[in-house]
């Protein structure tokens, strides 16, 4: 842990952005944060100022991403079918299996230096899940966890009806995180039929829109989620920038 912790966070809303472009950007922030941490070691302890943190909100055009522990066969369509669906495909460096991102899904990439908070990846994941659960409660949706599975679920205590509403997958090095979560607000859920989501073949997926049978404001979801992340991690929000 840093002696002088820094819980400031710069929030950036990138809007709809190409997956590769967002991946490159968060990688840049991730690497820069690690470099700043390493540079601190050469300074006297009382002069060390911990690097700040970043939180990216965005949506992506249709894309499937496969994590390091995933299986290529969990993508159930061919290259030609991918092109017909106007969807991209990437094999990436986060944990987890395959998932889908698309318009109407809120993607969050926290680039947090956990030395500013707590050095426990499992606790970090549970905090992210809790922020999602509290956000869904703001829309009168009851959500929870399933033991042994990362993410957030509706009717999590009913194996026959449990359905996933938020997927998660992260990478961490020197306690700096990247990648994050994908909350289904109102995406086209038919795209999930082309994969075995997160490598789990016996659970359905859902969205806020499907659960409520009505559309909701993406901005409202972001606002609630930021409120809960701020409270859980005791963040100090520097400012929020929007890219259109």
UniProtKB/Swiss-Prot annotation:
What the entry lists under Gene3D superfamilies is as follows: Bira Bifunctional Protein, Domain 2
Binding residues for substrate:
94-101, 167-169, 180-182
Quote the catalytic activity from the record. octanoyl-[ACP] + L-lysyl-[protein] = N(6)-octanoyl-L-lysyl-[protein] + holo-[ACP] + H(+)
Keyword line = Acyltransferase, Cytoplasm, Transferase
Q: Name one GO cellular component term.
A: cytoplasm
Q: What is its EC number?
A: 2.3.1.181
Compartments where located: Cytoplasm
Class of the enzyme per the UniProt entry, highest EC level? transferase
Q: Which positions are catalytic residues?
A: 198 (acyl-thioester intermediate)
Q: Which PROSITE patterns match?
A: BPL_LPL_CATALYTIC, LIPB
Q: Which GO terms describe its molecular function?
A: lipoyl(octanoyl) transferase activity
The pathway to which it is assigned is: Protein modification; protein lipoylation via endogenous pathway; protein N(6)-(lipoyl)lysine from octanoyl-[acyl-carrier-protein]: step 1/2
- Alphabetical list of InterPro entries matching this protein: aa-tRNA-synth_II/BPL/LPL, BPL_LPL_catalytic, Octanoyltransferase, Octanoyltransferase_CS
The UniProt record lists the BPL/LPL catalytic domain at: 49-237
GO biological process: what's one of them?
protein modification process
Site: Lowers pKa of active site Cys. Where? 164
Task: Kindly name one Pfam family recorded for this protein.
Answer: LplA-B_cat
Query: What is the similarity comment for this entry?
Result: Belongs to the LipB family.
Note in the entry: In the reaction, the free carboxyl group of octanoic acid is attached via an amide linkage to the epsilon-amino group of a specific lysine residue of lipoyl domains of lipoate-dependent enzymes.
Q: Which NCBIfam families match?
A: lipB, PRK14345.1
**What is this protein's function per UniProt?**
Catalyzes the transfer of endogenously produced octanoic acid from octanoyl-acyl-carrier-protein onto the lipoyl domains of lipoate-dependent enzymes. Lipoyl-ACP can also act as a substrate although octanoyl-ACP is likely to be the physiological substrate.
Can you name this protein?
A: Octanoyltransferase
Q: Could you tell me which species this protein originates from?
A: Cytophaga hutchinsonii (strain ATCC 33406 / DSM 1761 / CIP 103989 / NBRC 15051 / NCIMB 9469 / D465)
Provide the gene name from the record. Answer: lipB
């Amino acid at each position: 842990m840093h002696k002088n912790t820094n819980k400031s966070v710069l929030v950036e809303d990138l809007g709809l952005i190409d997956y590769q472009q967002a991946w490159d950007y968060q990688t840049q922030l991730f690497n820069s944060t690690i470099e700043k941490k390493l540079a601190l070691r050469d300074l006297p302890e009382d002069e060390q100022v911990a690097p700040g943190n970043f939180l990216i909100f965005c949506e992506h055009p249709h894309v499937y991403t496969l994590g390091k522990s995933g299986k290529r066969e969990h993508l159930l369509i061919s290259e030609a079918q991918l092109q017909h669906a106007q969807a991209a495909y990437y094999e990436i460096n986060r944990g987890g299996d395959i998932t889908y991102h698309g318009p109407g899904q809120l993607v969050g990439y926290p680039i947090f230096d956990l030395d500013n908070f707590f050095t426990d990846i499992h606790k970090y994941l549970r905090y992210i899940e809790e922020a999602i659960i509290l956000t869904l409660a703001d829309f009168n949706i009851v959500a929870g966890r399933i033991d042994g599975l990362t993410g957030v679920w509706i009717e999590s205590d009913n194996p026959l009806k449990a359905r996933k509403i938020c997927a998660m997958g992260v990478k961490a090095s020197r306690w700096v995180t990247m990648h994050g979560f994908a909350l289904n607000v109102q995406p086209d859920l038919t795209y999930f039929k082309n994969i075995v989501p997160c490598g789990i073949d016996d659970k359905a997926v859902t969205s806020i829109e499907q659960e409520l049978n009505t559309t909701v404001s993406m901005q409202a979801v972001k606002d609630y989620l930021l409120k809960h992340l701020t409270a859980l991690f005791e963040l100090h929000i520097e400012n929020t920038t929007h890219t259109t």
